[in-house]
Amino acid sequence: MFGNTLATEILSAEGVADIVSLTQHPLARINESFAFCHHGGWYECDMQTHALCAKKLKPSDPFAMYEYIECNFGNLGKNDADNTRLCAANATLDKDDMWKCATGYGPDSGPGMLLKSAQLADSMGVNAAPTVFINGKELQGVPTAPNLLKAICDAYTGAKPKGCSSALVAEEKKIEKCRR
């Protein structure tokens, strides 16, 4: 389902995907009335509009956007011309619907959603990617899988899933390593 990424590592911990409400907002800045992207210019913005369209086209699947993004990053430099088709299929999305959304106009199009995402980032003071919020609070430090998983499990008030014990094991190993 997922590639080898931070989100994959966390969500594959047993039961953790069931306690997480995952939302991604691509980071961009606003220049007059349009979004621009820092790291990869127009190509990064294009990828982000497609990812937002994946989210829009499968609103009941919070992980569709991640599946699309992970496929896209996994194919960078190899299948760029085919990424929309390949990655839409990987996330069980219709490539024509993806293209229509990503190249459309208006607030519900890919570019319109990217502009809204940039406005949200600005309003929250976000200026670096990734910036992670858990229950509305910004996670301090580098979001590694162990510290992010631990923060998620610590914030969860219900019965902890088995995957949370792996966060504790990772934290104990870190503490043990520091004692040596």
Predicted regions and their residues:
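Typically the conserved alpha-helix immediately C-terminal to a functionally engaged Cys/Sec
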Residues: 1-16
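Residue-level signal for beta-strand positions within conserved beta-sheet cores that form or flank
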Residues: 18-20, 64
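General small-molecule cofactor/ligand-binding pocket signal
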Residues: 21-25
